[in-house]
From Swiss-Prot:
Region ranges (Disordered): 1-102
One MF annotation (Gene Ontology) recorded for this entry: serine-type endopeptidase activity
Entry-linked SUPFAM superfamilies: alpha/beta-Hydrolases, DPP6 N-terminal domain-like
Keywords: Aminopeptidase, Glycoprotein, Hydrolase, Membrane, Protease, Serine protease, Signal-anchor, Transmembrane, Transmembrane helix, Vacuole
Transmembrane segments: 112-132
Lineage: Eukaryota, Fungi, Dikarya, Ascomycota, Pezizomycotina
EC number(s) on file: 3.4.14.5
Species the sequence originates in: Neurospora crassa (strain ATCC 24698 / 74-OR23-1A / CBS 708.71 / DSM 1257 / FGSC 987)
Pfam families noted in UniProt: DPPIV_N, Peptidase_S9
Topological domains annotated Cytoplasmic: 1-111
UniProt gene name: dapB
Protein's name according to its UniProt entry: Probable dipeptidyl-aminopeptidase B
Gene Ontology, cellular component aspect: fungal-type vacuole membrane; plasma membrane
């Protein structure tokens, strides 16, 4: 869905995909983590401490509730009472002078006062010495970051917007490119541009363990960063080794297409000769949409101009697999909506493990209506305009199925490499062409598991195809209306479990996430056609984007879960029998973890993301007898910065709305004073299955609002969001905007009753779905609670958004017209009851079209509603980055909010002309 200023403080170019993101996962970053896409073995192996001293960053304090008791604090001015809003009234200070100021004081009285004053000073000094020596007080700079402090002392530096926008508060993090060894060795990874090393090297983590006798030696794949061909020099952007590590597929001249996809020139690099040749023989400039290795390392399949081709490495001959590719027919790559909402990838090609078959999607979007994206300043196509058309905008027509419109027709095809033919397998009971979504394809030996749903995502079928016999059958059919009336979320984490009778697995199977116990849980289906699983997890919690990995040697499944808390993430392991579920991470302490496993699941990169300063380390998994641990990242610079700055006071808790416990975080100014009245900015995303309240380390825009501007910033995850049970999630089905806005209004009323809140200065803001929810909340509230709002790139009518995302939650406009009408932002009279609101949108937004904002503006015009401001950004997509636009967005948000809380918008509501100054007449 719309990209959002997301829960992980990341700004992405698409509505957040609604698991932990918006409809289309969050992308670009103002995030607190930065992924180094380059493999990080150099960091793992070069001069790294043996252990990470996490005691340096202990978690202290407890979760706050609504009536937390606060210690008295230093009353340093925040911007709440400082230069933005003016200081305290002079009447609060004495402005009277004694009438005896000019009189002389009796000498003995002065002597007596001097003695008493000296005694008092001496007493104060002695007390101060005792106070300091007892360590009852420390300046803020002497503490490591405490994310759960309820008070802050000291006078450190202020958090600035520039720091946030320049990513100075972003935690460093790294990704590891795990690969399997030629003979299946575990623990190998790719290292690119390591210190004092060749450009691309295969390393073995076990080499750093003196007790390991199985460690492989380093292997150089590419010596130099640059390579030459036909007297031209090239620099690879993408490097993908073959499974046998004898060749490397390189991509140069990469040009982005949509969120995930790109065009590039591809090369085959020979490791032995260190020479490259074009993937397409005799055409070194061929721009391809996709290229991928055969698992047997002897062939590459690629897509060019929407047709698929095969090149076997033992010859220059190219085999054309499909011939019907066109502007409307895609082979092996997805169209816009499948890339954005289904696959979350630019890849729709899947090799069988034996290299004998290629499965691929054929997408026909002939019947899908087009939407024009206009570029007024740039020309993303790279093409020069035709003579006489230099002053016209470039227009890109994209096939974009809006809710209720024709969807692309998608079929799964198979290419038999040995026979050289393409075939499909018809299975009885399949969904009709315009009612079918193919959401996941998993090779299971010589068979294929295919997940498909109807277009509104409430009926799912799992189909099993035997490519040898070219037959198939449905092995599972689930109607979610029989469970809770919700929907199926798309997952790409299903794991094939091959049979291993000697290891207790007599049949093939697979591990999948299913609906169970009011949430998402792991299930093991074996044999492949068995619809009745072994439950691996169950209980009042959920698994997250699971499974993470499977250790086939030890029959273990690894996964991330909310078992400890809905706003924490810990890693666990469980046997394929469903027994012995144990934590991998330390559950005795609060934590939010992510994890990346080696190909055999014997090693992992553990990423601690909060609430303390983030860190990373590579470990051996608990069942691996070859024990190993190395720190990758400690973020010492970030820890030092946290010591030297006044960060907001983060209070976590829950509020009860209609009997449902909703998570919140309240960010307070560093010198919070319970005797003051603070304005409040509510920030939310609120999209289905999203989560914004998390126990992660973050110094983001919301932190700046609290620590830099001195306001309170609150986030509440209402109903419809994730990880508080499906019952509270699926209530929004067919009625987007109703319950989410209700919960935001209820939360605002809850805060308005607090003694330290200024109930007349409440604002709400959000991006993407959060922008929609801002407008919907202002509409539903009609100025009763919220006075101000700031909406960026909002949906205003779900009939304008893409079919696959929207219909999952709303069904179709044809079957739910009342729901769509109710969900749209149409009551502009109610919007006029707010003091003022701000609307911003990127003109070239291919995700949430500017049509949404323009339609709302027209409705405002028709009703003569004028209490709003508008900013548009030429050539910016959903992330709003083009030509410095992102900085302007946050500058505008900041200044607009300060003016709102300063009362400036009240002054212009009924603007009146000032009296005219009398012109001075010239004197004679």
């Amino acid at each position: 869905m719309p990209s959002t200023y997301s829960d992980d403080n990341t700004l992405r170019s698409g509505l957040d995909r609604f698991r932990d993101h918006s409809p289309s996962q969050h992308r670009r970053s103002m995030s607190q983590e930065t992924d180094s896409t380059v493999s990080t073995t150099s960091i793992v192996f070069d001069r790294i401490q043996e252990r990470l001293d996490t005691k340096e960053f202990p978690a202290r304090g407890t979760d706050g509730d609504d009536n937390d008791s606060l210690k008295d604090e230093l009353n340093n001015d925040d911007l709440e009472t400082g230069p933005f809003l003016g200081n305290a009234s002079p009447s609060s200070r004495s402005n009277q002078r004694s009438s005896a100021d000019g009189q002389r004081m009796d000498r003995s009285l002065r002597r007596w006062l001097f003695i008493v004053s000296g005694a008092l000073v001496a007493t104060w000094v002695i007390g101060l010495i005792f106070f300091v020596s007892s360590k009852a007080y420390k300046p803020s700079s002497s503490f490591a970051h405490d994310p759960q402090a309820t008070v802050t002392h000291g006078s450190g530096k202020k958090v600035t917007l520039d720091q946030v926008l320049n990513n100075e508060w972003r935690a460093k993090s790294h990704s590891i490119s795990w690969i399997a060894g030629v003979n299946g060795e575990d623990g190998l990874l790719l290292e690119k541009e390591g210190a004092n090393k060749d450009y691309l090297v295969v390393e073995d983590v076990r080499a750093q363990n003196p007790s390991s006798v199985e460690a492989s030696k380093s292997k150089t794949l590419i010596k130099d960063k640059l390579f030459e061909f036909a007297n031209k020099t090239y620099w690879p952007t993408v490097t993908v080794p073959s499974r046998d590590l004898k060749k490397v597929l390189l991509a140069t001249d990469v040009q982005n297409n949509w969120r995930h996809s790109y065009y590039a020139v591809y090369w085959i690099f020979d490791v032995e000769t260190q020479q490259a040749e074009p993937l397409v023989p005799y055409d070194a400039d061929a721009r391809l949409q996709l290229a991928s290795w055969s698992p047997t390392s002897d062939a590459i399949v690629y897509t060019r101009d929407n047709n698929m081709f095969l090149r076997k490495l033992d010859s220059d001959k190219i085999v054309q697999i499909t011939r019907d590719g066109s502007a409307d027919v895609f082979n092996g790559v997805p169209d816009w909506v499948y890339e954005e909402e289904v696959l979350a990838s630019g890849v729709a090609t899947w090799w069988s493990e034996d290299g004998n078959y290629v499965a691929f999607l054929r997408t026909n979007e002939t019947g899908v209506p087009e939407y024009p994206i206009q570029y007024f300043v740039s020309r993303p196509s790279g093409e020069e305009p035709k003579p006489g058309e230099e002053n016209y905008p470039e227009v890109r027509q994209i096939k974009y199925p809006k809710a209720g419109a024709h969807n692309p027709i998608v079929d799964l095809k198979f290419y038999d490499v040995k026979r050289g033919d393409v075939f499909s397998v018809d299975i009885s009971g399949r969904f009709a062409d315009d009612d079918r979504l193919i959401t996941e394809v998993i090779w299971a030996g010589k068979q294929v598991l295919i997940k498909e749903t109807n277009r509104v995502s409430d009926v799912m079928r799992v189909v099993l195809v035997d490519v040898g016999s070219r037959t198939g059958k449905a092995v599972r059919t689930v109607d979610v209306n029989d469970i809770d009336g919700g929907w199926f979320e798309i997952s790409h984490k299903t794991k094939f479990i091959p049979a291993d009778p000697a290891n207790g697995r007599p049949d093939d199977g697979y591990v999948d996430t299913i609906i169970h116990n009011n949430g998402d849980h792991l299930a093991y289906f074996t044999p492949l056609d068995n619809p009745n699983p072994i439950m691996l997890t169950s209980g009042d919690y959920e698994v997250v984007d699971a499974p993470s990995a499977v250790d086939l040697q030890r029959n273990l499944v690894y996964f991330v879960s909310t078992k400890e808390s809905s706003i924490q993430r810990h890693v666990y392991q469980v046997k394929l029998t469903g027994e012995d579920m144990t934590p991998v991470t330390d559950t005795s302490k609060e934590g939010y973890y992510a994890i990346s496993f080696s190909t055999g699941a014997g090693y992992a990169l553990v990423s601690y993301q909060g609430p303390n300063i983030p860190w990373q380390k590579v470990i051996s998994t608990p069942s691996n007898p070859d024990k190993y641990e190395h720190v990758v990242e400690e973020n010492k610079d970030l820890a030092e910065a946290a010591k030297k700055h006044e960060l907001p006071i983060n209070i976590y808790g829950t509020i009860n709305v209609d009997g449902v416990e909703l998570n919140y975080i309240e960010r307070r100014p560093p010198h919070f004073d319970k005797n003051k009245k603070y304005p409040v900015l509510f920030q939310q995303y609120s999209g289905p299955v999203s989560q914004t309240v998390k126990k992660t380390f973050a110094v983001d825009f919301q932190s700046f609002v609290a620590a830099g501007l001195g306001y309170i910033c609150v986030t509440v995850d209402g109903r419809g969001t994730g990880f508080i049970g499906r019952k509270n999630r699926v209530i929004i089905r067919g009625n987007l905007g109703t319950w989410e806005s209700h919960d935001q209004i209820a939360a605002a009323k809850h805060w308005a009753q607090k003694d330290y809140i200024d109930e007349d200065r409440l604002a709400i803001w959000g991006w993407s779905y959060g922008g929609y929810m801002t407008l919907k909340t202002l509409e539903q509230d009609a100025g009763q609670t919220f006075k101000y709002g700031m909406a960026v790139a909002p949906v205003t009518d779900w009939r304008f958004y893409d079919s696959i995302y929207t219909e999952r939650y709303m069904r179709t406009p044809q079957t739910n017209p009342e729901g769509y009408e109710s969900a749209a932002v149409t009551n502009v009279t109610a919007l006029s009851q707010n003091v003022r609101f701000l609307l911003m949108h990127g003109v070239a937004d291919d995700n949430v079209h500017m049509q949404n904002s323009l339609t709302l503006l027209d409705a405002l015009d028709q009703r003569s509603v004028e209490n709003y401001d508008v900013q548009v950004f030429p050539d910016s997509d959903h992330g709003i980055y083009f030509h410095n636009a992102n900085r302007i967005v946050f500058d505008k948000l900041t200044n607009w909010l300060v003016n709102a809380f300063n009362g400036e918008w009240l002054k212009i509501a009924n603007a009146q002309p000032n009296g005219m100054k009398r012109r001075a007449l010239p004197t004679a």
